[in-house]
Amino acid sequence: MKPRTVLGIMDLLRDLGISFWRGDHFEPDRVTKRTAVITFDDGYQDNYPLLARLCSQHITPIVFMPTAYVGRQNAWEYSSRVFPARHLSADEMKRLVDLGVIIGSHGVSHMSLDGMTGVRLRRELHDSKAELEQIIGRTVDLISYPFGRFTPAVNEAAQSCGYRHALALDPEECRAGGGGFVLPRIPIYAADGYFSLKAKLTHPGRIERLKGRIIGRLAGGSIIRLRALN
């Protein structure tokens, strides 16, 4: 998604009377219904100028990083051979944190966690948290589940590793299986236009939720590629 598109989304939110969350410690209970929390999964390098600009506008972005790809190309993504992109480096993350960006975990390998158990699951949760904390010198207590997929066992393991909250996508799935630990988000994609964005933000009904689920299922190409890489 191009920076001007994201900035246009910010303008749309302002036009709808929505303010933006700002702070150095995310507490969802203190966020009102008319406040938007801006999050970015994957932490691509080309997001850096945009993230810095959002900070200058008194917006605190939260960026979720897959630690195996820090400073590396997005080999986990099935389209990476056609559209290669590099993730933020450790130094870039440090500079962004100094500007006000919050860094969260997106696992180690970016693989879906819902099929993992035991040592492998703990590695994704614990090791990513520990590595990010070592890089930025701050506590990392938020995780965005890759592809928005989770199970009660994943939630239990995440909490035992010290995460305060996990972020996923579908509100119904978060309510049913999250127990208040998993927070839903409104996904925004490059294909979204003005009217679909407005519909998502003002009347997030069945059609928009269905679109989100379909796009989530289309992530299967990336999941298959990840399995091949791992």
PLM feature segments, named:
Residues P49, R53-C55:
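Short active-site loop/helix that positions an aromatic residue
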Residues M1-T39, Y44-P49, G115-N230:
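C-terminal active-site subregion of NodB/CE4 polysaccharide deacetylases
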Residues K33-A36, C55-T151, G180-L183:
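Metal-dependent polysaccharide deacetylase catalytic core of the NodB/CE4 family, i.e.
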